[in-house]
């Protein structure tokens, strides 16, 4: 008999939900993680009494009551509402695109005026069959919104010109003809009081966890340690990139403590000009309405991913999705290995979808 029922590779949200639920079923699990901490990309670090989102802003939002109730077992959530602001040439615009945005951009007041301007600008482009992201954005929203709020930010995010990006990245532009800066449409939203790391700690209570462990080295030394493996790392890395590497985007952060109480007055400020090198600045204290004397900001830079870097989100274009389908076929042949999570499923998951995917998968276990 093997030492563990499950070896769970990755102590992020997917792995932690799996470990918590399997422990309730009486299974013995070992959770390992390559990083020196748990909680994956939702890890929060305490700096100056502020919970710093080390791997970028994470706002929990969902319309799934089952998932909301599940998460509330582990933490109380505050009433934070995500209302980012965009800066373009020293002008501030509210996001998402709503009447506050349009009023600032065109000095108008009514939804009818906004609709007429957008429709006029759309027609002026002459585009009927968009062939790339630039044409798609112009076709959907006209030139002003594209030039000021989409173009530079998107090019920084993807590291390519909008004319070189596929049109399907922007399926629609979420225009709201009301004065409402709430970014999400979901019924439930908030930040866990005490930060995200505390949630994962609670999920992993009573389960053996080892950090700073590389799975591939560990497997060589302990090939028979568990009956089954739950792998939440990169699916292409698991198979030694034998079909070629899937593409990801990476993100780099410059975090600093500032000797002031309030730097930008908002948790998230996007910089939409191409000439500004970072995509946004996060001021972490505002997620929890902090009153600390100092503040912590993180400048976020998007970058190409290469082997050895942290993969943040998959590049889900046709080429990469087709390659993932080939890896999926290999995965189906792997006995006693379950792939899941953002990297295992090669999917850009919001946190609620990660939790839902883990709970759904657990429903298949005997």
Q: What is each of the regions a protein language model found here?
A:
Residues 4, 26, 207, 225-227, ...:
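Short, well-ordered alpha-helix to beta-strand connector turns
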Residues 7-9, 32, 224-236:
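Short hydrophobic core segments
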Residues 48-123:
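Dinucleotide-binding Rossmann-like beta1-alpha1 core, especially the glycine-rich loop
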Residues 89-93, 99-227, 232:
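Active-site/ligand-binding neighborhood in enzyme catalytic cores
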């Amino acid at each position: 008999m093997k030492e563990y029922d499950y070896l769970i590779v990755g102590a992020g949200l997917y792995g932690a939900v799996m470990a918590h639920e399997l422990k309730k079923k009486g299974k013995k699990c070992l959770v390992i993680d390559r990083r020196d901490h748990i909680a994956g990309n939702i890890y929060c670090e305490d700096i100056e009494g502020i919970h710093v989102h080390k791997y970028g802003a994470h706002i929990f939002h969902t319309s799934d009551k089952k998932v909301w109730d599940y998460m509330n077992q582990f933490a109380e959530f505050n009433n934070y509402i995500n209302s980012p602001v965009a800066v373009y040439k020293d002008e501030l615009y509210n996001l998402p695109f709503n009447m506050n945005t349009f009023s600032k951009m065109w000095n108008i007041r009514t939804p009818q005026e906004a609709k007429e301007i957008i429709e006029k600008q759309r027609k002026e482009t002459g585009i009927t069959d968009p062939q790339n992201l630039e044409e798609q954005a112009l076709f959907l929203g006209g030139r002003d919104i594209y030039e000021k709020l989409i173009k530079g930010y998107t090019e920084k995010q993807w590291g390519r010109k909008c004319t070189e990006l596929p049109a399907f990245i922007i399926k629609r532009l979420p225009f709201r003809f009301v004065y409402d800066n709430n970014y999400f449409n979901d019924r439930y939203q908030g930040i866990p009081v005490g930060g995200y790391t505390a949630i994962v700690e609670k999920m992993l209570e009573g389960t053996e966890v080892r950090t700073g462990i590389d799975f591939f080295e560990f497997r060589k030394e302990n090939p028979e340690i568990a009956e089954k493996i739950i792998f939440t790392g990169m699916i292409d890395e698991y198979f030694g990139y034998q079909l070629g590497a899937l593409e990801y985007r990476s993100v780099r952060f410059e975090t600093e403590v500032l000797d002031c109480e309030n730097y930008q007055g908002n948790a998230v400020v996007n910089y939409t000009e191409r000439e500004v090198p970072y995509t946004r600045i996060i001021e972490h204290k505002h997620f929890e309405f902090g009153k600390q004397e100092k503040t912590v900001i993180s400048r976020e830079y998007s970058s190409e991913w290469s082997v050895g870097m942290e993969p943040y989100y998959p590049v889900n274009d046709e080429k990469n999705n087709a390659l993932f389908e080939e890896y999926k076929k290999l995965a189906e042949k792997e006995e006693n290995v379950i792939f899941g999570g953002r990297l295992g499923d090669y999917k850009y998951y919001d946190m609620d979808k990660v939790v839902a995917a883990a709970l759904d998968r657990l429903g298949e276990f005997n």
